[in-house]
Design a protein with these regions (language model features):
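N-terminal accessory/capping or targeting/presequence segment of soluble
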Residues: 1-99, 155, 164, 168
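Flexible, acidic/His-enriched mid-domain "rim/lid" segments that flank
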Residues: 89-179
Length: 179
C-alpha cells in the first residue's frame, strides 16, 4: 500500500525513485497518479517526502487531478539545455532530470527507476544522468518483484474504497448494457 512506500524504500536501501512515462498503460505511474491523460511525465519520490509529478504545460489540469505536487517541465528552459547539450536530446533530457532531482534534494544515494519508455531513450538518458550525478547509483529491479509491485499487493482503506467504487460503477455499466 502507498503508506508503506517509505518502509519498502528503506528495506531496499533506496533514497529516492523516479518513474518515467505515461499516466496510463504504465502501472507504476498509474499507481501514484490514478491515471489521467498525461502523455509524458516524470514522478520523483524521495524517501520521507511526498512524490512530485513533473509534466508538460498542456497536461497541467490532468496532472493536478493526481493530487500530487505538480511542477511543469517548462520551469526548466529545455531550449537552453538543448543548446548547452550540443543539440543532443538525450543529454538535454538528462540535464533537466538532474535539475529536477537536485531541486528535490537528490544528488547522492541509491535511486530506483521505474516506468515504461523506449529502452533506447531510457538507457541513453540514464547513462548521461549517471555521469551528471556521479554520486547516485541508479538501481533497476525485476518487474514482478519491484518496490512498486510490492506496494500494490496490499491496500489501505482509501485504496480499497477506490476499488469498491470502480467495481460498483463497472457493475452498473454492465447492467445498463445488458438491459
Amino acid at each position: 500500500m502507498k503508506s508503506d512506500i517509505d518502509t519498502l524504500m528503506q528495506a531496499r536501501n533506496l533514497d529516492a525513485f523516479v518513474i518515467f512515462g505515461h499516466g496510463e498503460h504504465n502501472p507504476p505511474m498509474y499507481y501514484f497518479t490514478g491515471g489521467g491523460h498525461i502523455m509524458h511525465a516524470t514522478l520523483i519520490k524521495r524517501r520521507g517526502d511526498a512524490p512530485v509529478l513533473f509534466h508538460g504545460d498542456m497536461e497541467r489540469d490532468e496532472a493536478a487531478k493526481s493530487g500530487l505536487k505538480c511542477i511543469p517541465f517548462s520551469k526548466y528552459d529545455y531550449d537552453a539545455l538543448f543548446e548547452k547539450a550540443g543539440k543532443d536530446t538525450l543529454l538535454a533530457t538528462a540535464m533537466r532530470c538532474e535539475l529536477m532531482l537536485r531541486e528535490l534534494g537528490v544528488s547522492a544515494g541509491r535511486v530506483g527507476v521505474y516506468g515504461t519508455y523506449d529502452l533506447g531513450w531510457s538507457f541513453g538518458v540514464l547513462a548521461y544522468l549517471q555521469k551528471l550525478l556521479p554520486n547516485i547509483e541508479i538501481v533497476g529491479e525485476a518487474p514482478g518483484a519491484s518496490l512498486i509491485v510490492r506496494a500494490m499487493e496490499t491496500k489501505d482503506e482509501v485504496e480499497v474504497e477506490r476499488i469498491r467504487a470502480m467495481g460498483k460503477l463497472t457493475t452498473e455499466v454492465v447492467a445498463q448494457t445488458r438491459d
